[in-house]
Amino acid sequence: MTDLPSNLANIFSEDKEPSDIFAELLPLLGEQLKCDRIFLYTRNPQTKVGKVVSCWRRTLEIPDIDDYEWKQEPESLAKEDPLFAAALNAKPSIFIEDVETANPEIVNKKFEQKTFGHKALIHAHLCQEGLLWGILQPCIFAKPRTWQESDRHIIAQLETKITPLVIKYINQTQK
């Protein structure tokens, strides 16, 4: 496997604004991964200001993410959230099959339940040259999920496609 599925790859074939690509990508990725919600968090690594730029939900019963305005990241976030700390350190993306049983050194169960409410997730780190520019987070709410090799491949491919677009988006909006 070396290529993205064509429905996802086609999104990147035209010259579009990053926000338009994100809005088009998330619903298709949600269907491809069979998940309940996907959001894209973007951040300026110099100022540590970030926001959710796009969120897709399978149904309206799935909770939305309410971080659509630029805001300063709490200084305590990396201490509270080991997934975010891993992302800040440009570690490989993390695939969590079950928040309830995950290693507490990797997942703060209480933080995940309170903040996001999901059961399984992918914490895809959008990094360049050791700097975190964003996080793509597909997730499942009803039950744990075993992430397949094909899911991992899609995320790895998307990380390389999305990261430059996130950087462009940040540079366009954070002047």
Cite the ranges covered by each PLM segment.
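A short, aliphatic-rich beta-strand micro-motif
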Residues: 119-127
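GAF sensory/regulatory domain recognition
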Residues: 39-75, 79
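Sensory-domain boundary capping and coupling elements
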Residues: 84, 126-141
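Regulatory loop-to-helix N-cap segments in sensory/regulatory domains
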Residues: 139-158, 165-174
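Signal-transmission linkers at sensory-effector interfaces
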Residues: 1-23, 31, 52, 168-175
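Short regulatory alpha-helical segment in sensory/regulatory domains of signaling proteins that mediates
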Residues: 9-16, 25-34, 42-44, 88, ...
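Signal-transducing coupling segments at domain and membrane junctions
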Residues: 97-120
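Soluble sensory domains of the PAS superfamily and closely related sensory modules
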Residues: 85-94, 101-104
